Amino acid sequence: MTVVIAGAGPTGLTLACELTRRGIACRVLDKAPDLFPGSRGKGLSPRTQEVFDDLGIAPAINSGGMAMPPFRIYAGHEVVAERSLVEMLGTDIPSGPGIPYPGFWLVPQWRTDEILLDRLRQFGGDVEFNCEVVGFTQRSDAVSVMVSQGGAPELLHASYLVGADGGRSTVRKMLGVGFAGETFERERTLIGDVRADGLEGSFCHVLTRDGQVSERFSLWNLPGSEHYQFVANMATEDVPALTLDAVQKLVVDRSGRDDIVLRDLRWISLYRVNARMVDRFRVGRVILAGDAAHVHSSAGGQGLNTSVQDAYNLGWKLAAVIYGAPEKLLDTYEEERMPVAASVLGLSTDLHHRNFAPAKGPAPQLHQMDITYRGCSLAVDDRVFQGNLRAGDRAPDALLDNGVRLFDVLRGTHFTLLTFGAQAPVIADVCIQQMTPSPDYDVTATTLVLVRPDGYIGVMTESGRTVLEYLARVV
């Protein structure tokens, strides 16, 4: 036994896929009887779509979803506006030859989880449901994990324990790390999946009485389903019962309409908005990822995306350490992901308080394509003349001279060394790819670019020795 993962949501499943495809044995435990049934985290960012492309599930994700629909805003029965996601949130979405997935993709979370679980099983893994972590102890070389499966206790011995068990993480609480931040006690968010009669077209239907979106009831079309996801924010004292009748009354109260009839309530949840983050992502051999490490408002759709990318950052590093890389490689997980989580916390909180009001400052960047690890210890750039692309940045896609996409070359568990005319050193288990400089790759012919397994640039240099020294630190 090598790794125990607590939690079979998008974070835990992504991490399990990353480990099992590298030959790392792991046990994925979840206290629920099955996968999460709701649509909750439904918007996949361009960067998350790239992660799923690398995992080999892009076709399933594409067929299971649709482009993010526009918002249709109603004042009673009248349609008063139709706006894109870009217009509603004041964001921008980059495009170009280096970006294969230029927009957000709408996939209900239950479907994303199903696709990830199917992929995990193809890699030889699985999930143990009705099984929860109830305690653990760790030594310098191992962690012992106490679990309860259907009431029966079991003691597991593992190299590492990863808490990917959500905002109420048992692993985090037992680990005893700080979880500072704020809770918005004066408000609640109601969310669920329901069928609705009386609506036409694929939109996010924003129901209001007078066109003012601050008091709204939203219904999102869900692809591949007859259900809608509904969302409504409210004061704590106005929370209704979690029943179909109460939600139906809320629709009438918010919209002034009785022609929209709800039925078949599949899932419903009421939650307090928190903006909190741990002060440590790892303590010894216990690691936190996703909502177990940071929670925030759903505004801007950053939660699932940030969590998946936590797992993607951690997976290759954890596997490398298990195979013999220096353990301090794991320190770079917190070094790189904690600033990202802090930034997302601030962004989502700002969007939450704005409540669709226009931004007063720069447009919020929701696509996550600009996340960079520049300045971190795994970003080495010793060139004298540096262009726009730097070590620590995401490696852009490109069309190669042979007609193949660069992302097709990067896909997999390996490092890739990009050359632009210079003689590349021969390195075992590193893919060598010849390229031509371009606006996205504004480099000289003597530049070497080493791309990490997670698609970020580890090295930009003109020295083969720099590449070899870097690899000695990470493999």
Swiss-Prot record:
Q: Which Enzyme Commission numbers does its entry carry?
A: 1.14.13.231
List cellular component terms (GO).
Answer: cytoplasm
**Substrates-to-products reaction catalysed:** a tetracycline + NADPH + O2 + H(+) = an 11a-hydroxytetracycline + NADP(+) + H2O; tetracycline + NADPH + O2 + H(+) = 11a-hydroxytetracycline + NADP(+) + H2O
Key words of the record: Antibiotic resistance, Cytoplasm, FAD, Flavoprotein, Monooxygenase, NADP, Nucleotide-binding, Oxidoreductase
Q: What induces it?
A: Expression increases >200-fold after exposure to tetracycline, doxycycline or inhibitor anhydrotetracycline but not tigecycline; expression is repressed by upstream TetR (MAB_1497c), is not under control of whiB7. Probably part of the TetR-TetX operon.
Phosphoprotein listed as a keyword:
no
Q: How is its activity regulated?
A: Inhibited by anhydrotetracycline.
One Pfam annotation reads FAD_binding_3
Example of a GO MF term = oxidoreductase activity, acting on paired donors, with incorporation or reduction of molecular oxygen, NAD(P)H as one donor, and incorporation of one atom of oxygen
Subcellular location per UniProt equals: Cytoplasm
Q: What happens when the gene is disrupted?
A: Cells are about 2-fold more sensitive to tetracycline and doxycycline, but remain sensitive to tigecycline, a broad spectrum glycylcycline antibiotic.
Q: InterPro entries under this entry?
A: FAD-bd (IPR002938), FAD/NAD-bd_sf (IPR036188), RIFMO-like (IPR050641)
Q: Which cofactor does it need?
A: FAD
Q: Name one GO biological process term.
A: response to antibiotic
Per the record, the major location class is cytoplasm
Recite the other comments.
Answer: Although it has a similar activity to Bacteroides TetX it is phylogentically distinct and is thought to have evolved by convergent evolution.
Q: What does this protein do?
A: An FAD-requiring monooxygenase active on some tetracycline antibiotic derivatives, which leads to their inactivation. Hydroxylates carbon 11a of tetracycline and some analogs. Confers resistance to tetracycline and doxycycline via an oxidoreductase activity; probably monooxygenates the antibiotics. Does not act on tigecycline.
Q: Which family does it belong to?
A: Belongs to the aromatic-ring hydroxylase family.
- Name used for this protein in its record: Flavin-dependent monooxygenase
What organism, scientifically named, is this protein from?
Mycobacteroides abscessus (strain ATCC 19977 / DSM 44196 / CCUG 20993 / CIP 104536 / JCM 13569 / NCTC 13031 / TMC 1543 / L948)
| Species lineage | Bacteria, Bacillati, Actinomycetota, Actinomycetes, Mycobacteriales
